[in-house]
Amino acid sequence: MPSTPYDLVQDDQDLRVPLHAEQAFFHGITFQAKFVGWEEVPRPNTRAEIVQAMRRIRYECKVQNLKKRKVTIHISVNGVRVVLKKRRRKKKNWTNDPEDIELLNHPIYRIFYVSHDSSDLKIFSYIARDASTDTFKCSVFKSHKKSQAMRIVRTVGQAFEVCHKFNLHKNSLEPNDERSDISSSELLDVEQISEQQLSEDGERGGGDNETPKKEHLAITPDLNHTQPQRPNHLDIMPSHSSLRKSNSLLCDVDDKSPGSPSSPRSEITQLKDQLEAQALQTRQALGQLMLVREQLISETNARIEAQARTQQLLQQNRELLEHLASLGAYNEQQTAGLTSANIGMAPQQSQLQMLLQATSNNNNLATINQQISNLGSINQQLTSLSHQLSGLNQQSQHLQNLQQQQQQQQQQQQQQTQAAPTAATPPPAAGGSSPYPSMSALQSISNQLQQQQQQQQQDALSKDLFQVNQELLNRLQALNLNANPGQSQPTPSATAHNSFFYVNPLSCTPATPNNNAGGAGGFNFLTSPAATGTLTPSPLGTMNRNSFAGSSSLNEDIRLSIEQNLNNLEEQLKAAVSNGNLAGLACGGSTSTRDTSRSSSTLDSPSSPRLRSSNNNISPGSSNGNQNHNNNSNSNSSSSRETRFNTVLLRVTDEAGHQRKLSATPSFITRSTSEKVPNRSQMMSQVQRTTWARHTTK
């Protein structure tokens, strides 16, 4: 539909008053216009299709640069006749000149539609059915003025009205009535028109798809029923009732004439009606068939698109699964250190396969991301378990070393016990009996008993290690892949690093009662990392029990040694507090922060682990030999302690005037730059002790 508003032409003439006299249509009315062009169009159903066809014809003529030709339009009861306009016209005749070149000629009943363009009121057109080809042709014209185009359209409408009114009048006349308002010449003209129409219908022989009753144009409704009103636009469509009446009246003009049979013509009309109904049904069936076909095509296209989308989604899921598999393989390569003899039976690969099988049935990306995070938490747990296993392996190695050392000590004791009696006692008499064979037998029996005890301890240790490994394997198998990562992690402890480590006492050399005889020569578990190797931490969140509960004798020895060392530390702390010498705390292996906080001049003097380790490496012997050896070690340690800590001392006086001696062992300040900083002892020697102590000993 056109977007511009419909502008009516200013026409002061009333529509109820005819534009032309009825007698003029029997002679013909002539108009001058320009012929734009014509084109075959399908049967129009709406006004929009007619307007589109009209504008399409104008556009094509403009594109092809076709010149508009001046024509003369003759409108009469015979029809609309379009001829070329001559340049020189001698005289005006009401009759048509046979020498004129005829372009178009359509009878009134074949005109289907007449209208003008709402956007350009100078343009008008009409659609008529061609008799030879039985197709619709749209002819477009352009007038000189807008009012002239309106007059041409109304003239065509009035011509149809005159024909319709004449047929109604002829139908109301009786056959014997000779009175008539119309002259004999006019009746002859109407009869000739009707005969010509019937002959054309007979020539078609029922080949038309449309009956003549729909081919006539109903410009105005029946005058007997309605009064003419001024329309908003001049789109005039035919009505079924008027078409039937006009067709029947035109046919009755000759039917009621004498000597003409009425039955064949009525049969022809009935056959035409049936043919029209069948043609209408076939058109409806074809329309439904085309609609179903279009729906089928759209459904097939939608199905093809859906299949393509599913294929694309399957390809994306396959790529995601391959990526997950590659991530699992990458994690396995990173955790290659777990494949040791202790955890060779850990079901890592089976769990990854189970994860891949579970994710292959799940296409949701959120669950895939959650499972990837679960993999990360599982890897963290596996690494922590691997650290625990490595610590257990180190502990087992330390136990083996301890057993070897104990065996060596026992062998040395046996050698010493065998060498001592031979050197101390003279050989016995030849004839007398000696008690030494019985003593040797007792010693062999005691050695056998000790060996049996050692074997039992080793068996208990091996069983305990096997139980620990089984427990770790069970924990590995019990890891839930689909669990929440926050639940799978170990429980945090109260420390700042969320993990508390304890030192396994069995990873160190046990302190026997012979070694613990001296106060300072005993083994100290607190500060002796270099004596027996590194201590392996074990998280309390994963192992809360003692891994070597079966070795009762070793645990008892270790407990006694720890208690004795703690007692020695307490005595040394008391002596240091009473004497004011905080440097003596270094012999115990720990630095007291409570006493050093009172003086900023106190310097750290940690004892060397090598000196302590030299005191701890004491081979056990007999009871007498052990006592002598312990006494010597005590004297050596005390003398070395006095010489080591009395070399550099600082005298500090407090506010009360008491003097105390503090160790001034230098602790060098490390710098990242090349700046040379003097030693702390050199700096403190230049400070006055009294003024310095007033500010620092509060």
From Swiss-Prot:
Bias regions of kind Basic and acidic residues — which residues? 201-217
Region spans: Disordered? 191-240, 396-460, 588-698
**Biological-process GO terms, alphabetical:** postsynaptic actin cytoskeleton organization
Can you give the residue ranges of the PID domain? 25-194
Q: Does the keyword Ribosomal protein apply?
A: no
Molecular-function annotations in GO: nitric-oxide synthase binding
Please indicate which superkingdom the organism of origin belongs to. Eukaryota
Swiss-Prot/TrEMBL keywords:
Coiled coil
Where is this chain compositionally biased, Polar residues type?
436-447, 662-672, 679-698
Q: Which SMART domains match?
A: PTB
Q: Which Pfam families match?
A: PID (PF00640)
Tissues in which the UniProt entry reports expression? Expressed at higher level in wing imaginal disk.
GO cellular component annotations of the record: glutamatergic synapse
Q: What does this protein do?
A: Putative adapter protein.
Q: Which PANTHER family match?
A: CAPON-LIKE PROTEIN (PTHR11232:SF17), PHOSPHOTYROSINE INTERACTION DOMAIN-CONTAINING FAMILY MEMBER (PTHR11232)
Name recorded for this polypeptide: Capon-like protein
**Naturally occurring in which organism (per UniProt):** Drosophila melanogaster (Fruit fly)
Q: Upper lineage ranks?
A: Eukaryota, Metazoa, Ecdysozoa, Arthropoda, Hexapoda
